[in-house]
Swiss-Prot record:
GO terms for molecular function: ATP binding; sulfate adenylyltransferase (ATP) activity. GO terms for biological process: hydrogen sulfide biosynthetic process; sulfate assimilation. This is Sulfate adenylyltransferase. Pfam families: ATP-sulfurylase, PUA_2. SUPFAM superfamilies: Nucleotidylyl transferase (SSF52374), PUA domain-like (SSF88697). Keywords: ATP-binding, Nucleotide-binding, Nucleotidyltransferase, Transferase. It catalyses: sulfate + ATP + H(+) = adenosine 5'-phosphosulfate + diphosphate. It comes from Staphylococcus carnosus (strain TM300). The keyword Transferase applies. The gene is sat. Pathway: Sulfur metabolism; hydrogen sulfide biosynthesis; sulfite from sulfate: step 1/3. Signal peptide: none annotated.
């Protein structure tokens, strides 16, 4: 029988060498829950709560808590933690100056959700202010508030709290219960399936034909595919997570070999940080046990803020430090002449024959109630999306 260490390292070594686990169980958990009744309280928004969870379950290994000033500054300026480990996105806990003044260094803070439920405890080691414009410019490449990630930066409190965390309760993902797998559980799954090489695919969109083509192209060279959709906070116009999850199940069931693809949620908030977020996504998939990671066109982008292949260019600079193989794909399209999916590498035909697909186009057509042509989406997927969005509109009283 395989040991825990053998399972953890079966496919890949976690980022930083150790898969972090800051979840408490049993008597230790019960004791901290009791103690926390006396701790000062802080309510986390959905974004910070998802960060807390990902630190605790090891998705953000080697982080053990919210970043201190040395790590934060190094990440913003140099894409590395203070100890030299590659890390591209600040993972921080913002509060107002008034809130920060209420907490003493060395104290423990009870971390609650907006549902007034206790989720964890922060051991407060640092409080520090930061330059919002610098964070926006360095991390997102712009200071424009029209960028959803930058808007979040400007809306945050002016002080960051830092220190190690412990998790006592999990946020509710019960609607995706079957697919709620921690990094250690995903690694166990790969071990049980005998997958030694696994490609991870990050998405916040329904899987359209271009995605499917890229996933299957990658699958030709590895043992398995981990479809790892983000189900945390996204933009208001993104397709709701429950609808997307239905669409992922349908496409895997109907168009992928049963023993070659698996689905597991990534419970993170979407930052839309483009190239820098592509690096974070690769690190997270390494922690989930993947050996390969797909970076396509405008990865984690929004609007026209990033170049089509800017994420691929940045991640290529750090590939030696990543510990995961990056699979870079050109923009795929449907060629009406080839009558197939293709890229510029495989199709000789003029652009007038190319039907370009994107998550944005799919969302627009669905919002306008337009049918999705077969070049865009598998019919089973289109049906799920149309039905799911209709359900959401009815729930929201939109008819």
């Amino acid at each position: 029988m395989a040991t825990a260490t053998q399972i953890i390292n079966y496919t890949s070594t976690p980022h930083g060498g150790e898969l972090i686990n800051r979840q408490l169980e049993g008597a230790e958990r019960e004791a901290l829950i009791k103690e926390a009744e006396a701790f000062p309280k802080l309510t986390l928004n959905a974004w910070s709560l998802s960060d807390l969870e990902l630190i605790a379950i090891g998705g953000f290994s080697p982080l053990t808590g919210f970043m201190g000033e040395a790590d934060y500054t190094n990440v913003v300026e140099n894409l590395h933690l203070a100890d030299g480990t590659l890390w591209s996105i600040p993972i921080t806990l913002p509060v107002t100056e008034e809130q920060a003044d209420a907490y003493e260094l060395g104290s423990k803070i009870a971390l609650y959700g907006e549902d007034d439920k206790l989720y964890g405890v922060l051991d407060l080691q640092e409080k520090f202010t930061y330059d919002k414009e610098k964070e926006a410019e360095n991390v997102y490449g712009t200071t424009e508030e029209a960028h959803p990630g930058v808007k979040k930066v400007y809306e945050k409190g002016n002080v960051y709290l830092a220190g190690p965390i412990q998790l006592v309760n999990r946020p509710d993902h019960s609607e995706f219960e079957e697919f709620e797998l921690d990094p250690i559980e995903v690694r166990q799954m790969f071990h049980d399936l005998g997958w030694k090489t696994v490609v991870g695919f990050q998405t916040r969109n329904p899987v359209h034909r271009a995605h499917e083509y890229i996933q299957k192209s990658a699958l030709e060279t590895v043992d398995g595919l981990l479809l790892n959709p983000l189900v945390g906070e996204t933009k208001a116009d993104d397709i709701p997570a429950d609808v997307r999850m239905e669409s992922y199940q349908v496409i895997l069931k109907n168009y992928f070999p049963e023993n070659r693809a698996r689905l597991a949620i990534y419970p993170a908030a979407m930052r839309y940080a483009g190239p820098r977020e592509a690096i974070l996504h690769a690190i997270v998939r390494l922690n989930y046990g993947c050996t390969h990671f797909i970076v396509g066109r405008d990865h984690a982008g929004v609007g026209d803020y990033y170049g089509t292949y800017e994420a691929q260019e940045l991640i290529s600079q750090y590939e030696d430090e990543l510990g995961i193989n990056i699979m870079k794909f050109e923009h795929a399209f449907y060629c009406t002449k080839c009558e197939n999916m293709a890229t510029a590498k495989t199709c000789p035909h003029d652009k007038k024959y190319h039907v370009h697909l994107s998550g944005t186009k799919v969302r627009e057509k669905l919002r306008n109630g337009e049918p999705l042509p077969k070049e865009f989406s598998r019919p089973e997927v289109a049906e799920v999306l149309i039905r799911g969005l209709r359900r959401h509109r009815e729930q929201n009283g939109e008819g």
